[in-house]
């Protein structure tokens, strides 16, 4: 009787409809900024700013982050911080500067 129950429960297991043999994942990544260079130091926005490059030998520099304004222009945080000490406007469009976000 135990043999009959074991075989009947095995037959109730649903058969696989398909099996994934290989998975090639693809990702798409886009910028939401128009310019990918910092207009202040001219380095690529994802590279270190000139201040962080100079401090790289001492290894005491903070993480070099990117800062976006509400005008959607992006600069290195260190670069725009130095700029804002003298002028409170975006270096590219001369609008009043407000941070939209900052980080990587």
From Swiss-Prot:
Location(s), subcellular: Cytoplasm; Nucleus
Zinc finger (RING-type) stretch: 49-94
Pathway: Protein modification; protein ubiquitination
Binding sites annotated in the UniProt record for Zn(2+) 3: 71, 73, 90, 93
Binding positions (Zn(2+) 1): 38, 41, 76
GO biological process, one term: protein ubiquitination
Pfam families: zf-rbx1 (PF12678)
Gene Ontology CC, one term: nucleus
Record keywords: Cytoplasm, Metal-binding, Nucleus, Ubl conjugation pathway, Zinc, Zinc-finger
Residues given in the record as Zn(2+) 2 binding sites: 49, 52, 64, 78
Example of a GO MF term: cullin family protein binding
InterPro entries cross-referenced by the UniProt entry: RING-box_E3_Ubiquitin_Ligase, Znf_RING, Znf_RING/FYVE/PHD, Znf_RING_H2
Domain notes: The RING-type zinc finger domain is essential for ubiquitin ligase activity. It coordinates an additional third zinc ion.
General function of this protein: Component of the SCF (SKP1-CUL1-F-box protein) E3 ubiquitin ligase complex, which mediates the ubiquitination and subsequent proteasomal degradation of target proteins. Through the RING-type zinc finger, seems to recruit the E2 ubiquitination enzyme to the complex and brings it into close proximity to the substrate.
Family label: Belongs to the RING-box family.
Subunit (UniProt): Part of SCF complexes, which consist of a skp1 or a skp1-related protein, a cullin protein, and a F-box protein.
Protein name, as recorded: RING-box protein 1
Organism: Dictyostelium discoideum (Social amoeba)
């Amino acid at each position: 009787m135990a043999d009959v129950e074991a075989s009947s429960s095995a037959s109730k297991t649903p058969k696989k409809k398909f099996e994934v043999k290989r998975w090639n994942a693809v990702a798409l990544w886009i910028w939401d900024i128009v310019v990918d260079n910092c207009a202040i130091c001219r380095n690529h926005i994802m590279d270190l700013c000139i201040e962080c490059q100079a401090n790289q030998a001492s290894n005491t520099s903070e993480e070099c982050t990117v800062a976006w304004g509400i005008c959607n222009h992006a600069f290195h945080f260190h670069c725009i911080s130095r700029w804002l000490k003298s002028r409170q406007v975006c270096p590219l469009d001369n609008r009043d500067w407000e941070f939209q976000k900052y980080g990587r």
